[in-house]
Amino acid sequence: RGLGDVYKRQVLDKADIVILEVNENLPWVYGGLDECIHIDDVDMIVEGPHDPLPSIQTPPASEAETRIAEFVVENMDDGATLQLGIGSLPNAVGQMLAQSDLRDLGIHTEMLCDCYLDMYRAGKITNKRKDIDRYKSVFGFAIGSEDLYDWVRENPGVVTYPISYCNAPSTVRNIENFVSINNCISVDLYGQICAESAGTRQISGTGGQLDFLEGAAVSPGGKAFICLTSTFTDKQGEMVSRITPLLNPGDIVTDPRSLAYYIVTEYGGVNLVGCSTWERAERLISVAHPKFRDELVEHARQQGIWIRSNKR
């Protein structure tokens, strides 16, 4: 048992030959479900020296990411159970939570990173209000610094579960006040979310983002925040809006508009739950970069979705 359970049982059940490699540098981590294999089911064991585990440092948050994190933290409550995605922006949320007045937070996440350790050291993580796995921080895999690896080592309060458990909406729905915080690349005026490609260029996989949005939607008191800076600079040095009239050709829809909850940029956050198509457009334009708002309004008119929300 190392830094994650992930899909081990599913892979082992499908394998014709099972070879285990012993890595003396991996921390021994407690597991919560199907984390063991009987020696009779193993065909070969390989031992030998290994390089030290990679230590990954998250880059510091930008000013825009810090403002996004402030909005997210302001809209959280004591006793929330957290899932943070990958990158500097969710990490900024975690670091801000560590300095906040919030109490009795819990962890139920796919990826465990250093910001959770920051929150734990600040006394924010107790897991005492969780409805399942109480007093335990649940994760799928851990990646970060040596300090993080030391924290999870033989720690009965930090346990790894397979993705089929920790990511499953059927699991998350049983956690009251579950809060999901993730990045994306772009959002269109309908609320469709792209978090894995720029056009046809693949940047990442779907990961657990959609799972956790579905889970947060059915968690009592649950919330989901999709965060993005309002613009990026392209190869020609031009500023480009991440909030677009329509997703660009080839953009992959990671999350359908029906699951969009809070969309947050450095200009604020908007709640899209229950909004009509034109209300979504109006709210999303309000958190776009000011330079692009008039242009987005004109596109919304052309698409037939620019109607003020007080006109139904």
Go through each PLM region and give its residues.
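C-terminal catalytic subdomain
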Residues: N177-V264, V270, E279
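Gly/Ser/Thr-rich active-site loops/lids in small-molecule metabolic enzymes
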Residues: K8-D16, S100-D118, A195-I226, P290-E295
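Structural signature of FAD isoalloxazine-binding scaffolds in flavoprotein oxidoreductases
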Residues: K8-V22, I37-G48, H108-E110, D114, ...
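Short, small-residue-biased leader/transition segments that mark boundaries at the very start
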Residues: G2-Y7
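A glycine- and small/hydrophobic-rich beta-loop-beta segment
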Residues: T109, A122, T126-Q202, G208
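N-terminal active-site beta-alpha-beta segment that forms phosphate/nucleotide-binding
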Residues: I56, P60-Y149
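Extended hydrophobic packing segments that form well-structured cores
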Residues: L259-R312
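Small/polar-residue-rich loop-to-helix segments that shape phosphate-bearing ligand pockets
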Residues: N25-T66
